[in-house]
Design a protein with these regions (language model features):
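Structural signature of WD-repeat beta-propellers
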Residues: 85, 131-132, 172-173, 217-218, ...
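Positively charged n-region of N-terminal signal peptides that target proteins for export
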Residues: 1-4
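Short loop/turn segments that connect beta-strands within beta-propeller blades
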Residues: 94-98, 140-144, 181-185, 226-230, ...
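Bacterial N-terminal signal peptides
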Residues: 7-13
Length: 413
């Protein structure tokens, strides 16, 4: 009898499940708290702050860069793009000749090739490459020949940076910042953060400014050091007691490369904050609560930010207030049952006739443009232009102002 009853209820259960699943499913976009305008203003930019429109009328073409996925933002120097990929190869690509000049295997002898983080630094005719191994590999930029490799105490997942003409800084996953003399091939000093949080989260590389370096550790610390000596000037902890709940493998770290202007550093953190930090004393000038920030740029008096809620916003660099918020999604897509997430590049401001436009490149193949209306205010709805899909990085040439879009394996320009 029980079997008969259950068999009779089965259609009802299936109908109920169908009704339950037919509504719009919440995803990361819905769950991310949205930014709201706090003080509506007309945004104003000087001519020097507005780029020439990098998307020329000439049709772009796609060129192959690598057989494997590019894992870090490429370096550009003297008309050549240098990149490192997921299988341990470093490539040089000529932008003028539109071809690969050389390719070098820096993971010789490694059987399990699955690199996913790293960076390429060009300095004085040499490349300094990391790829989530323990090695810093130095290559001749012209030929691709290996000059030397240096083994570090732990894995290096971030891009190395030059502190001086001979001092290179690299950060390990175990919260060590190590200074390496490229002339003598010796380690000069080491600075360590507190006990690290085990995490797969990648955070930004150290940033050098005026003889000092700002570094973010997975312990939640931000430290400002003398780049020459490694002597600590100040430290600030991103994790406050009020932030601590259930132990997590998601550390509080800086997630956007710090932008330094006028003795202040601007950056977003993984625990939902945008901070303007006074570099003189390590004290925040202001803190703005803003969750899941993807990218950030500073243009004039405004911080332009994007987030996982598919928004772009202009914040006052003076007090952090939101002056304008735009939508990075078409109106027709908002009512869809499953709205896809997207990755957004750093916003930039470009010339648009006699005016300007705020531009955001998205991984879904769309360029979102926001232009002031007749009243001088910028609307929240964008003009959407189809470009290249799966863009991971972009680079605007300082020589001709042209846009270069880089996907996992190709470059479009």
């Amino acid at each position: 009898m029980k079997k008969i009853i259950l068999f009779g209820l089965l259609p009802v259960l299936l109908i109920s499940c169908d009704r339950f699943g037919s509504g719009r499913v919440k995803n990361l976009i819905d769950l991310t708290p949205k930014l709201e305008v706090q003080s509506k203003e007309k945004l104003k930019f000087n001519a020097s702050q507005i780029k020439k429109n990098p998307f020329s009328d000439q049709k772009s073409k796609s060129y192959s860069l690598a057989k494997n996925t590019i894992i870090a933002k490429p370096a550009f120097a003297k008309g050549v793009m240098y990149s490192t990929d997921s299988k341990g190869f470093v490539s040089a690509y000529s932008l003028k000749e539109k071809k690969i000049l050389w390719q070098t295997d820096i993971a010789k002898g490694v059987l399990d090739r699955n690199f996913n983080d790293g960076g390429v630094l060009y300095s004085n005719g040499k490349l300094y490459v990391t790829n989530s191994s323990r090695y810093l590999v130095v290559l001749d930029a012209k030929s691709g020949d290996e000059i030397i490799r240096k083994e570090y105490p732990d894995i290096v997942r971030n891009k190395p940076v030059m502190a001086t003409d001979r001092l290179l800084l690299a950060q390990t996953v175990s919260n060590q910042l190590i200074a390496y003399d490229i002339k003598t091939s010796k380690f000069v000093w080491l600075h360590e953060g507190e006990l690290e949080t085990i995490s797969t989260r990648s955070h930004v590389h150290p940033v050098v400014y005026d003889g000092n370096v700002i570094v973010s550790y997975s312990s939640g610390e931000i430290v400002y050091l003398d780049a020459q000596s490694g002597k600590e000037k100040w430290r600030y902890n991103l994790t406050k007691i009020s932030d601590i709940g259930i132990p997590s493998f998601d550390p509080s770290v800086i997630v956007t490369v710090p932008i330094i202007s006028g003795e202040y550093a601007y950056f977003a953190t993984s625990n939902g904050k945008i901070i303007k930090m006074d570099l003189d004393n390590g004290a925040p000038a202001w803190i703005k609560v803003a969750d899941d920030i993807q990218s950030l740029s500073l243009v004039g008096d405004y911080l332009l930010v994007t987030n996982n809620a598919r928004q772009v916003a202009a914040l006052s660099s003076h007090n952090g207030k939101a002056l304008w918020v735009g939508n990075l999604i078409a109106q027709k897509d908002r009512s869809k049952r499953k709205v896809r997430t997207a990755l957004f590049q750093e916003p930039f401001v470009a010339q648009d006739g006699n005016s300007f436009s705020i531009n955001v490149i998205a991984s879904n193949g769309d360029l979102y443009q926001f232009k002031p209306d007749a009243s001088g205010f910028i609307p929240s709805e964008p003009t959407i232009i189809s470009i290249t899909k799966n863009v991971k990085y972009h680079w605007i040439s300082c020589c001709n102002g042209k846009m270069h879009l880089i996907t996992g394996r190709n470059i479009v320009y």
